[in-house]
Amino acid sequence: MASSSSSRNWVYDVFLSFSGKDVRVTFRSHFLKELDRKLISAFRDNEIERSHSLWPDLEQAIKDSRIAVVVFSKNYASSSWCLNELLEIVNCNDKIIIPVFYGVDPSQVRYQIGEFGSIFEKTCKRQTEEVKNQWKKALTDVANMLGFDSAKWDDEAKMIEEIANDVLAKLLLTSSTDSAENSIGIEDHIANMSVLLKLEAEEVRMVGIWGSSGIGKTTIARALFNQLSRHFPVSKFIDRAFVYKSRETYKGANPDDPNMKLHLQGCFLSEILGKKDIKIDHLGALGERLKHQKTLIIIDDLDDLVVLDSLVGKTNWFGCGSRIIVITNNKQFLRAHGIDHIYEVSLPSKERAQEMFCQSAFGENSPPEGFEELVVEIAWLAGSLPLGLTVFGSALRGRKKEYWVKMLPRLQNDLDGNIEETLKVSYDAIGNVKDQALFRLIACLFNHVKVRDIELLLADSGLDVNIALENLVDKSLIHVRNDHVEMHRLLQETGRNIVRSQSTDNPGEREFLVDSNDSRTVLSEGIGTRKVLGISLDTSKVSEFCVHENAFKGMGNLLFLDISSKTFIEEEVKVHLPEKINYYSVQPKQLIWDRFPLKCMPYTFLRNLVKLEMHDSKLEKLWEGAMSFTCLKELDMWASKYLKEIPDLSKATNIEKLDFGHCWSLVELPSSIRNLNKLLELNMEYCGELETLPTGFNLKSLDYLNFNECWKLRTFPEFATNISNLILAETSIEEYPSNLYFKNVRELSMGKADSDENKCQGVKPFMPMLSPTLTLLELWNIPNLVELSSSFQNLNNLERLDICYCRNLESLPTGINLESLVSLNLFGCSRLKRFPDISTNIKYLDLDQTGIEEVPWQIENFFNLTKLTMKGCRELKCVSLNIFKLKHLGEVSFSNCGALTRVDLSCYPSGVEMMKADNADIVSEETTSSLPDSCVLNVNFMDCVNLDREPVLHQQSIIFNSMILPGEEVPSYFTYRTSDSQPFGTSSSLPIPLLPTQLSQPFFRFRVCAVVSASNGVYIGVYSRFKGRIGNKFDSFGEVHNFMEIEKGIHLCIFDCRIRLYKDNVPLSQLNYDHVDINIHITSGDWRSTVVLKEWGIRLLETGSSAENRLGNPNSTLPHVSQAEEGNMGYYTHVQGLVNEIENSEDSGDNNVETERSKKRMRLHHFI
């Protein structure tokens, strides 16, 4: 397989294909000289005469060149050498080709006509018809490309210069850097920077490269410089050494001191011109020397505005077309200089990060066998930061796997010194002590916390939170995404190390405690001091202990206490409190304590609280009477199942959020809640004993109200509100106020906890309250809901509609189209007979356990449908084949539809009928023409015992990623079969003879059917080995196919496979393969269960179908090339065993094995 341009290191920039008879001493010599002037390397053959023995060198030069410039001249086609060069160029899929028509009309080359065509025909007389056709196609293909026609140029020198500029522009976007490690992803950065630089403009433009330390700003800038410098007569990369020296020069000086600025400018001009000790006698001299020069200047790691103003103060200091690029981690610094064109360097994707790490650790883009999971783990530990990836890779390079495993704990817990040194520079450069304090606070306690929460908790801290956050963002030390503050893992660890350095011996002397063992020590031994501002203790990382009775006595400044588990594993109380404990000096602002062991809260803990969070506590009550907790904003007692009452909140008037979800012992809400005029959220879900709500609500600020599964709640009060999210599902509410209206409601969920129709008012009274603002509506278990009124058509913003277990619902409105609706769920509406038709924009359609009898032909109008599930539809009899016309459809399930007998077009209005004939296609030509261009599906017909399977099996225009059918034998449709029953965890092989025609296509396609006996889901993997008579071999590893919906029984598991037929761009037919061994390996989705492969079969499929043509490159939407999922890496062990078995059963000949994808590159895809 040819290397991609993003990973290939090229020997030459250009290969020039030409006829020496026409252009050797004219065009060629001038063009090569222009390339030299632009520092573009080109392959030369001046001193060699072409002979047969030199062809391998020419062939290699073509492969090693990034761009091919093909000069078509009158006699080009007279040379078989030229035509073979052209053919080789075209066969290199990664080659950029620039055609030049020099003294010849492009149409003569394109169609091989005129004088050019006559010469071509003479050359072809000595060749076979096959060679002639290959040359013709190559000439036509290249002549159809955008190029240069000399007839349109009056000045050949200008044409040559323009061709060279075109080459340079293409190299700018595609050339790799000197280091393969640094080249990964660099093209994307260069392309984005090219847009900002706007090189074609004559203006002088200043551009900033902005990003956090270690993210690769300098790497990008150097790659840019390597490519751009050829464009500029004067160019200089000003590195950090000069910048640091300039800082020292300026340090302590008067910013307005002209002598200091003159000195800086003199040093700067010396750097640019490469001369020592240039003296400048006035501040305008720098501009005078450069204003007529097209200049490229890149300044690295600068954040001092005075220095920047002195060096590149104004655009008119530089000549037309100049570009000044400034690299910094301070965005405000760029804005202050008037630089508006700023490129933000973001972290690489997870996949790119792993490639970068592999380049550093292995010198390749992918890991060796056995290192896959370690690479994923270490790339995550580096947080995808390029600096971390490089440092970690260098530390592990050349080491054995055992060493890597031993190093993991150190990488998890300790920050590498080189990384910390680099990142600490960014911290030191913050300058403002308040901003530094907030940086440490975020690193230790507030990473991934809402901005609003940070603002509330630090409202009176004097830290100027909003300004400090903005400054940290500008310096690339944090990001704010979705209203949450995010700090990179390595920056976070740097901040924590800064705090640890405050006291290496006594953690009680640090401002923040974040190491759980240190926190445990301070709390259990009572050694905390007034320096401690915050404690975070992850209970999942410590053993059980008791807090010292004087633990809080010395920590009078403690503001933030977080004792919680960072895992989802339930655990017993880990942190105990003694009966006599001194709380009086502690007044935290935030108290988070999972499984708090006391029955009542200590009062002193509450006085200044802004946030109180006590999940799964032992509390029975919070406090007595009406306490004046005016600072309290959030009260979260989730899952405190012993809590019997909510205290008087009448004096806690600033509360914005109350969460008593899963507090099973609560019986009522206190009447004082109606005084909470700032309340935004009230969550009471799963409060199973809650019976009544206070009346007289006037909570105009309330936005979210949740009474889900409050089974005993029977009344709902009238109250004024601007609520947007109301959840009343699984309640026993019998009646709603008649004038209840929510004008701003966006999400509404309601339903009954029982099905007693006598107590159910139904949904009709709710119709008037349904506002056009509604985006989500859930109606659950409403027995007397028979139909929906036509007023539904007014819900133009509705995106999701769930009507579930409404067993008497018979119809939906017709003649309406809810254009915003993308998800419709009618699960359990057993009397609904007609397929819904209320929106053609639906993506997700759940019709499980409905009474629908057919999927009609109109299903083809659901253009955006991606998932259709109709499990347990016992009345379903027919499914239209039009379902396969939906190109976005990926998952279909008709399992347990016992009445389903056919999947066909019998109800299509044109009257198209199915055709059956022995040994013939089962679908007519007319039917086939109406099927889709491409469709990749996961289909489930499990337990559809009456289904006619033939029409489905014969669909070659559909690519089945997985299909489950009923049956206990391989259908006759599969022409190659085996019947040897295989127990759990084993494999089976089928030899298939190959015809030359089957290897002349770009893909080898086949369909597999495995008869599987299993109790639950299974995975089936495929491995193919092509073999020839001379011992040559070619391996292909397919994906792992997921059949996780399988239930206990015997089923047919069917899936399609596609193998790319290539080996370094040579068709397999040239490698003389005469048969292929196709092997499948089956494993259970649950290690506790067994699976038996009873028999299996294969049918070869035609290639070149419309589906194949649309899908094109195998690295597109086909599941065979999707990314591996970490959870199933263990499957590779089974496949390797399979390969080993095959190897052992054959004669040795490993040197002849060409592997399409090495085992380390095997990829998994799981359909969920």
UniProtKB/Swiss-Prot annotation:
Source species, domain of life: Eukaryota
Biological processes per GO annotation? defense response; regulation of root meristem growth; signal transduction
* SUPFAM superfamilies documented for this protein: L domain-like (SSF52058), P-loop containing nucleoside triphosphate hydrolases (SSF52540), Toll/Interleukin receptor TIR domain (SSF52200), Winged helix' DNA-binding domain (SSF46785)
Q: What happens when the gene is disrupted?
A: Loss of [5-(3,4-dichlorophenyl)furan-2-yl]-piperidine-1-ylmethanethione- (DFPM-) induced root growth arrest and inhibition of stomatal closing mediated by abscisic acid (ABA).
**Annotated Gene Ontology MF terms?**
ADP binding; ATP binding; ATP hydrolysis activity; NAD+ nucleosidase activity, cyclic ADP-ribose generating
Q: Where is the TIR domain?
A: 10-171
What CDD domains does its record include?
Answer: NK (cd02019)
Q: Give any Pfam family that matches.
A: LRR_3
Compartment annotation: Cytoplasm; Nucleus
Give the EC number(s) under which this enzyme is classified: 3.2.2.6
- Which terms are listed as keywords in the entry? ATP-binding, Cytoplasm, Hydrolase, Leucine-rich repeat, NAD, Nucleotide-binding, Nucleus, Plant defense, Repeat
Q: Which residues form the active site?
A: E85
Query: Which GO cellular component term is one of those annotated?
Result: cytosol
Reactions accelerated catalytically: NAD(+) + H2O = ADP-D-ribose + nicotinamide + H(+)
Expression is induced as follows: By DFPM in the root meristematic zone. Induced by salicylic acid (SA).
Q: Where are the LRR repeats?
A: 539-562, 606-629, 631-653, 676-699, 701-720, 721-744, 795-820, 839-865, 873-896, 1065-1089
Q: Please give the record's comment on domains.
A: The TIR domain mediates NAD(+) hydrolase (NADase) activity. Self-association of TIR domains is required for NADase activity.
Q: What does this protein do?
A: Disease resistance protein of the TIR-NB-LRR-type. Part of the RPS6 locus that contains a cluster of several paralogous disease resistance (R) genes. Resistance proteins guard the plant against pathogens that contain an appropriate avirulence protein via an indirect interaction with this avirulence protein. That triggers a defense system including the hypersensitive response, which restricts the pathogen growth.
Quote the subunit structure annotation: Part of a nuclear protein complex made of VICTR, PAD4 and EDS1. Interacts (via TIR domain) with PAD4 and EDS1.
Protein name per Swiss-Prot or TrEMBL: Protein VARIATION IN COMPOUND TRIGGERED ROOT growth response
Q: Which gene encodes it?
A: VICTR
